[in-house]
Regions:
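Predominantly soluble domains enriched in secretory-pathway, periplasmic, or organellar proteins
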Residues: 1-306
């Protein structure tokens, strides 16, 4: 029997909440290292990698037992944060914010294979292109994005964006990069080939996370300061003009953070840092249906189908 779960990281109590989406309740709580912040689940669903930022460690969790089975450490971990996996799941990319480095980790051995300095300020997140060939790394303090080639495992470019970029994702069609700039409350829509900024949009206060629905129809942006989610219709057609447009701003809890969709794209789930809960958003009605209580200061969130 298939079950759907959320894995929610509770930063201020050093735990993970396992939420059963059928029961809409926490079914298990697991202790982690200090300050679990960001998470990624392997493509086969067997493992999760949890960046514990203030603990300077990456916890490896077995998703069958929900036990921490390994801890990855390195002397140059300094607020390890953004995590992402290659398309085959064989390599984990980790951004270490204050040491301004990217670590490439073999997921079969959980050994660090390569350390790459970005030479940029506060390298914070990891976002892969849909084809898995490119990694985009927002540098909050340098107001730019670092581009890495996955095949060569080398940095190939940096390009400027707005102030304080954090939430970054590539549209499923591979043609546009969306960047949420938290310091001036804007969204940039950028051509992946030319890196030209095609559109600039004002969104909510302090946008920090950005995800696309599986079909690419919507982008959701978590606005931390204004406690809401900007719903962007990626191809709104007005009198023959197709453009991305904010069609709704959904109130959620205080300090909206991590967002994830279910596999079908029918629901999105938003971790509310300061109300200690997760908002369930119905993507057909574009309304918050309910909230699920979790631990203290939830932020990183992942969807798991077993």
């Amino acid at each position: 029997m298939t079950t759907e779960k959320l894995i929610v990281l509770n930063k201020d109590e050093d735990t993970v909440s396992i939420v059963n989406l059928e029961a809409k309740a926490v079914e298990k709580t697991i202790a982690t290292d200090h300050n679990p912040h960001e998470i990624v689940v392997t493509p086969d669903g067997k493992k999760s990698y949890i960046a514990c930022s203030l603990g300077n460690v990456v916890d490896v969790m077995d998703n069958d037992t929900f036990q921490i089975t390994n801890r990855i450490k390195h002397p140059d971990f300094s607020f390890p944060h953004g995590v992402g996996l290659t398309k085959d799941g064989d390599k984990l990319y980790l951004a270490s914010t204050y040491s301004e480095k990217v670590f490439i980790i073999n997921t079969k051995t959980d050994e660090i294979e390569k350390v790459i300095p970005t030479s940029q300020k506060y390298s914070h997140m990891i976002s892969f292109s849909p084809d898995g060939k490119i990694v985009y790394i927002p540098n909050i303090g340098s107001n730019n994005i670092t581009v890495m080639d996955v095949e060569t495992e080398e940095i190939v470019n940096h390009f400027p964006v707005g102030p304080g970029p954090e939430g970054v994702a590539v549209h499923p069609n591979g043609e546009h990069i969306y960047v949420a700039n938290q310091d001036d409350d804007t969204l940039f829509v950028i051509d992946t080939k030319t890196l030209e900024v095609l559109h600039k949009r004002r969104v909510g206060g302090t946008p920090v996370r950005l995800v696309f629905s599986p079909n690419g129809k919507y982008a959701l942006i978590a606005n931390r300061q204004s406690g809401d989610v900007s719903v962007i219709e990626t191809e709104q057609n007005i009198n023959g003009q197709v453009r991305p447009w904010e069609i709704k701003r959904l109130p959620v809890g205080v300090w909206a953070g991590g967002i994830v969709f279910n596999e079908a794209g029918t629901y999105a789930y938003v971790a509310n840092n300061k109300t200690n809960d997760v908002s369930l958003i119905n993507m057909n009605t574009l309304k918050e249906e309910q909230r699920i209580d979790v631990g203290i200061h939830p932020d990183g969130i992942a969807y798991l189908k077993q």
